[in-house]
Amino acid sequence: MAKASETERSGPGTQPADAQTATSATVRPLSTQAVFRPDFGDEDNFPHPTLGPDTEPQDRMATTSRVRPPVRRLGGGLVEIPRAPDIDPLEALMTNPVVPESKRFCWNCGRPVGRSDSETKGASEGWCPYCGSPYSFLPQLNPGDIVAGQYEVKGCIAHGGLGWIYLALDRNVNGRPVVLKGLVHSGDAEAQAMAMAERQFLAEVVHPSIVQIFNFVEHTDRHGDPVGYIVMEYVGGQSLKRSKGQKLPVAEAIAYLLEILPALSYLHSIGLVYNDLKPENIMLTEEQLKLIDLGAVSRINSFGYLYGTPGFQAPEIVRTGPTVATDIYTVGRTLAALTLDLPTRNGRYVDGLPEDDPVLKTYDSYGRLLRRAIDPDPRQRFTTAEEMSAQLTGVLREVVAQDTGVPRPGLSTIFSPSRSTFGVDLLVAHTDVYLDGQVHAEKLTANEIVTALSVPLVDPTDVAASVLQATVLSQPVQTLDSLRAARHGALDADGVDFSESVELPLMEVRALLDLGDVAKATRKLDDLAERVGWRWRLVWYRAVAELLTGDYDSATKHFTEVLDTFPGELAPKLALAATAELAGNTDEHKFYQTVWSTNDGVISAAFGLARARSAEGDRVGAVRTLDEVPPTSRHFTTARLTSAVTLLSGRSTSEVTEEQIRDAARRVEALPPTEPRVLQIRALVLGGALDWLKDNKASTNHILGFPFTSHGLRLGVEASLRSLARVAPTQRHRYTLVDMANKVRPTSTF
């Protein structure tokens, strides 16, 4: 409805869905299309014009200026969007409404009509030489025409797949601008009558993000035939369609679709499917985004004329009819068209994704979301618009965090927060040998990971959900006791039959895994899967069991399956990162990075990322990651100590610089002396400095209160060891520390 570029005019439009791939050399234009299925009930699905937003200014209506902030925030406040200008409706009028010959096709058979040849100029109206149907590409309404005694036509604003679209003023409502669109092609009188009767349900569609239907009217054309028109709200602004080669930033595109998904959800809730989502059918106004062009809306599972746009329309629609899954497909294709360089063939977008597109390589979760949304198997797509919206929000948080460097944490609707941390003490723990004389492991264990990972939240629709909520935070043994009581009816006050519950046996599996009884948990999981199939929660616990048994390849496969299902979730990413680290796979870097950059409350990811970077030789990057742990975290001190150890440990003296030694010392010095591990890290830093000084020279400026000389550092190491000896847990270790202090002390001179 707003003014559009030449490129927009040449883009895909609404057409009947092809029942089979055309083999003819002639290609129909990419407008919204339909396929007719005469063997099914033919309700609610009739041709309609698409809003092709090509306009040129003519004259101007009076407008009232308003002061608005120059930007607004979408996507839950995560994305800043410039406000669209408020456009005068009359600026949308076309001064010369002509359909180019290249876009003239028969409305009935789809063959080219009205084309010029070497001898004659193409006629704007006539009869199709192939099927004999009448066609006309001339406007049926002219400026000044009064439709239904109420709507004064001002002119054409676009041409859709089934005719011209007009701007009119409602003389009964203070000259309010409206849009008139033909219901079906004017050459089909019977379809006109049916459309007027069948499309009345659209008037009941009321949603703030959907264009409002005001009326259905008829007007006699110049041949004396009645033509039905739908009268709709005029939506000023601009469509999301961009010129060829122009793409939106991923965050912006996601924010737009998050505004539209509630409208689709509303339609689905009242048994309708939109059918024709694409960038040109989403209008960005000064105040909001709106779906326009309801001509393709139909009832779920209805057949007849099924409208959509090739390249956006789900391939199975000719078999299944319109479904929620076919609408989900169009959301994925719309996102892809807005952000990716999609290849075209015969004037339409090719199915699938260009896997080498840099956007997909940059935003892994975004690519996973698109692949699920457009999965060729409709059963594998998001099941509802709400589910897709939740995952899209999670992906948006990742994208914005990656783009800005600022974490954007959010609560999951299907996973609990991490139950604890893992790997936080790994690097500093080996310095505990100073404290107790015991050698401490520096590797992750599967048990440590499993007890820390998030767990799937209880499905609120499960028959046992109300009982299970009380056991979520219980210890494993208590959980098993509660579940046994539930099975015997002790917790069932309402007489509910728990035999059909999926969550109750799943809670048992979780408790058994936490207790380390993997064999019994696996048997229960297999029994449950035999009854209900491998649902995603079962797949999650299967991966956990495989992680505990050391089957890292299978665990990775099944955690990945969960991630592909819910690409906006951080829980499977953290699980994959930890599994990869146990397996010695360098991929942990990628997933630890994603989790940490998105949510700086997942401390395990920070320490995991630091370990990964340190293993790659990137000590600077590892320390930088540890420095990102916020001071409000209870692991802040451990992060500072770990950064000091990272700077010095596991390296030869030739790899260490004086500045790195002093940096480690500053980190220790900044910590409170009451921190239990400060003494041992002081000893480590001073001892490392002493070893380094044997082969290098340094300034004599003090470090941790001692001169940076051999004599000064020996005094420092001695003092640290004697302090540790005073708090040693055993007499034997105390003597060991005192012996070490005596050996390192500088030689006394008299």
Curated annotation (Swiss-Prot):
Effect of C128A: Decrease in activity
InterPro entries with a match to the protein in the record: Kinase-like_dom_sf, PknG_rubred, PknG_TPR, Prot_kinase_dom, Ser/Thr_kinase_AS, TPR-like_helical_dom_sf
GO biological process, alphabetically ordered: glutamate catabolic process; glutamine catabolic process; intracellular signal transduction; regulation of cellular respiration; response to antibiotic; symbiont-mediated evasion of host immune response; symbiont-mediated perturbation of host defenses; symbiont-mediated perturbation of host signal transduction pathway
Outcome following mutation: T309S: Decrease in activity
Effect after changing C131S: Lack of activity
Enzyme Commission designation: 2.7.11.1
Polar residues composition bias: residue spans: 17-34
Compartments in which it is found: Cytoplasm; Cell membrane
Phenotype upon gene inactivation: Disruption causes delayed mortality in mice. Mutant accumulates glutamate and glutamine.
Impact reported for C109A: Decrease in activity
GO cellular component: cytosol; plasma membrane
Top-level taxon of the source organism: Bacteria
Record keywords, A-Z: Antibiotic resistance, ATP-binding, Cell membrane, Cytoplasm, Kinase, Membrane, Nucleotide-binding, Phosphoprotein, Serine/threonine-protein kinase, TPR repeat, Transferase, Virulence
Catalytic activity as recorded in UniProt: L-seryl-[protein] + ATP = O-phospho-L-seryl-[protein] + ADP + H(+); L-threonyl-[protein] + ATP = O-phospho-L-threonyl-[protein] + ADP + H(+)
Region span, Disordered: 1-66
Post-translational modification as stated in the protein's UniProt record: Autophosphorylated. In vitro, incorporates up to four phosphate groups on Thr-23, Thr-32 and Thr-63 and/or Thr-64 and/or Ser-65. In vivo, is probably phosphorylated only on Thr-63.
Domain Protein kinase: 151-396
Mutagenesis / variant outcome for changing T63A: Lack of phosphorylation. Does not affect kinase activity
Annotated catalytic residues: D276 (proton acceptor)
Keyword hit for Metal-binding: no
Effect of mutating C109S: Lack of activity
Phosphothreonine modifications at: T63
Subunit structure: Homodimer. Interacts with the FHA domain of GarA.
Function: Phosphorylates GarA. May play a role in metabolic regulation via control of the phosphorylation status of GarA. Plays a crucial role in the survival of mycobacteria within host macrophages, by blocking the intracellular degradation of mycobacteria in lysosomes. Required for intrinsic antibiotic resistance.
Family classification: Belongs to the protein kinase superfamily. Ser/Thr protein kinase family.
Annotated protein name in UniProt: Serine/threonine-protein kinase PknG
